[in-house]
Swiss-Prot record:
Enzyme Commission designation: 6.3.4.19
Domains as described in the record: The N-terminal region contains the highly conserved SGGXDS motif, predicted to be a P-loop motif involved in ATP binding.
UniProt xrefs under HAMAP family: tRNA_Ile_lys_synt
Pfam families reported for this sequence: ATP_bind_3
Function (record text): Ligates lysine onto the cytidine present at position 34 of the AUA codon-specific tRNA(Ile) that contains the anticodon CAU, in an ATP-dependent manner. Cytidine is converted to lysidine, thus changing the amino acid specificity of the tRNA from methionine to isoleucine.
Swiss-Prot/TrEMBL catalytic activity: cytidine(34) in tRNA(Ile2) + L-lysine + ATP = lysidine(34) in tRNA(Ile2) + AMP + diphosphate + H(+)
Keywords: ATP-binding, Cytoplasm, Ligase, Nucleotide-binding, tRNA processing
Enzyme class: ligase
Subcellular location: Cytoplasm
Amino acids binding ATP: 30-35
GO cellular component: cytoplasm
Name of the protein in its database record: tRNA(Ile)-lysidine synthase
Gene3D superfamilies: HUPs
Annotated organism of origin: Chlamydia muridarum (strain MoPn / Nigg)
Amino acid sequence: MVIRLFENDKQLEVFFSSLDKKKKYLLALSGGSDSLLLMYLLRSRGISFTAVHVDYGWRETSYQEACDLASLCEREQIPFILDRQEVANPMDFSDIENIARQYRYELFYRLCKERLFAGVFLGHHADDQAETILKRVFEGAHLGNLKGMARYGTYKGITLLRPLLHITKRQIVEALDNYRIEYVQDATNADERFLRARMREQLFPYLQEIFGKNIRQPLLFLAEDSAELREYLDQQAAPFLSQVIDNEIGQFLPVGQELLQTAFLTKWVCKQFFFKQGLVASKGFLQTVYDHLVRRSEARLRLRNRTVLVKARGVIIESIY
């Protein structure tokens, strides 16, 4: 029934029409409003899937919630996988959010490989996307890396599917509430000891109150612009990166006068050159490299455990022997 509220959603229509319905998929089912709505969407669109739930045991109610989800899936005739991971006190870990996320994604990876699932459906929505983008802004991410989460993404070769990125949390909750469908309200989502919760409960309301407008949509527009910029930069960088050669010293990126005429593109090409060798270069490091290239002055720099040589006509990453 809920799905009728979204049956005229063109983005969902395009998304689901692109899927191979002969294949089987995996659904990350937390029991929250977003993943539960996604479960009903998949059923209504004729997608064959198995639900997987991870119970970390963080809350006293988590065991019963997992049992309730198992019962729900049994009633709906949806295959269900329950994975229990007992964590005595999540606050004993400084980065528990990322630790838990990494565990889930590794579980998804194993299941997809072992049971040949074509991909994993994730319930990330527009509010999650806005939070991700703002977090990256504050972290100083490159303009080409503010694109947020991808509707079609990958993790170690498995496909990640996020059809709800254009739908807000309010729309999801209203849809479920209107049809009296119960969902788990995870208290940790509002626990301000966690960064995401602080952003959700404090930062976004504060910024919107001061600014006087909803800031989520502009952030989503920023992500779209960033994705287009990233695509453009990659196209422009490709001819230069194709000139990388291996020599007796290491990998050599030629940098001619044509490229140096555009500082932004030069630094992007260098950034991707380093990244392809497993090196993440900071903004300051890239600026230093660019300054030496412009002055045609040689330099010997360290980037993590590698030596970078800036020459008059290019950049070399020394090989490790």
